[in-house]
């Protein structure tokens, strides 16, 4: 079952976030549990976090800078040990309920990139940008 998270779920969300962080290319940057919970508390109020028995997805509504009337549901994090597609569909359903005109997902720049590219293309998505990070530390 997939449901909207509440403030009572913040510890579980932080646990899942720690698992995701340890797997991700961001793992070299320390995971801050308290800040994660504070951020996710705001997201519960102003966006959405959806939970399943095996994972989570979180995101928010975002107007495109070049056309603010064009509002999309932007995925900020998505982590599941299984049934990840069900979370994706639930996020899309949430976005549709909010009246968005599109969805934006990202994928980690890791060994799963090609697999995720295939998943997104099969789900009707097209690549619109690629992100890069430069550490100054």
Predicted features by range, described:
Residues 64-74:
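A conserved beta-turn-beta hairpin within the catalytic core of GNAT-like acetyltransferases
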Residues 104-116:
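Conserved beta-strand-loop-alpha-helix junction that forms the acyl-donor binding cleft
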Residues 51-62:
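Conserved beta-strand in the GNAT
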Residues 86-102:
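Conserved acyl-CoA
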Residues 1-30:
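Short amphipathic alpha-helix that is part of the acyltransferase structural core
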Residues 117, 121-137:
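C-terminal "cap" of GNAT-fold acetyltransferases
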Residues 72-84:
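A short, internal acetyl-CoA/4′-phosphopantetheine-binding micro-motif in the GNAT/acyltransferase core
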Residues 38-51:
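A short helix-loop-beta-strand connector motif used in the catalytic cores of GNAT acetyltransferases and
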């Amino acid at each position: 079952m997939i449901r909207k998270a509440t403030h009572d779920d913040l510890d579980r969300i932080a646990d899942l976030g720690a698992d995701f962080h340890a797997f991700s290319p961001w793992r070299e940057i320390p995971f801050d549990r308290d800040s994660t919970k504070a951020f996710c508390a705001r997201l519960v109020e102003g966006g959405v976090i959806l939970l399943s028995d095996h994972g989570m997805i979180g995101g928010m509504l975002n107007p495109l800078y070049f056309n603010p009337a064009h509002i999309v549901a932007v995925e900020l994090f998505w982590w599941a040990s299984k049934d990840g597609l069900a979370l994706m569909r639930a996020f899309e359903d949430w976005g549709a309920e909010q009246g968005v005109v599109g969805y934006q997902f990202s994928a980690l720049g890791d060994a799963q990139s090609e697999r995720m590219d295939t998943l997104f293309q099969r789900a009707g998505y097209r690549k619109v940008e690629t992100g890069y990070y430069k550490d100054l530390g």
